[in-house]
Amino acid sequence: MLDKIKQMMSKGTSSNTFSYSQLSSFKNCPQQYKIIYLDGVRKSSESIEAFMGKRVHEVLEWLYSEENRVKPYITFDGLCQTFDNLWVEHWHKEIHIADTRKNSDFYYSIGKRCLSNYYSRYGPTFDQRVEDTEVDLKFTIGEHNFRGIIDRLDQPEPGKWIVHDYKTSKRPKTERQAMNDIQLALYQIAVEQNFGQVDEISLTWHFLRIGSEVTVLHTRDELEKLRKKLIKSADKINNCLGNEINFLPKESILCHWCYLWEECTAKVGPNPVKRAD
């Protein structure tokens, strides 16, 4: 597989479309990147944190659906009912809990807290000028193809855009960390390439567990530095192709949330974390 990809690249065609998830996976563990994105291994196993986060994202996507945007208000009970329905609908037997002190009820309550914090801030009218949710964009950075999915994109006035990203993790970013974050910088570049009039783009992180937000606006120089950082990350991955030694495992605490132990050369047997009840 690696040799085939390397041969395609040597002919001047890139077989790879990068995403933030891919760049993050390679940085955290090159072997995880290889197993998922080169070998094509996909599993139904997921962490309870990831499951909860997906359901919260789906509720907020539903909240800003075209049907709901024309309503004068949305009740919190409506949000909770949607969350409950999605939780039950998508629950499966391969959800795992790394922290054995916690159970599924604990993470369910965190999901409800995330929605409560968001509702308290923006409800019940939710009258933001939403362009779309789950915006799937393709774009290029340097010689690399990229794809990004934006949680929500607003256009409060012509030429002015706001990229929104929902986070259900427990650690919020500082403004300085947000300024150096490549994920939303990636999305800013995507918006600039895919929409006509773009005069200003602000990037907003919603840290739903604690109900806080961070918003940044990049200067052209700041964005250019992040663009070069993205190119460097993509170049590094491409330069590794064709040599197995470049995709060694990187063991860390993140291994507890990885379900590729049976494929990983650093592990023996499946991940021993418990299944959620």
Model-predicted regions and their roles:
Residues M1, T17, D77, P158, ...:
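Metal-dependent nuclease catalytic regions and adjoining charged, substrate-binding loops involved
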Residues M1-F18, D136:
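Long, acidic, intrinsically disordered low-complexity segments
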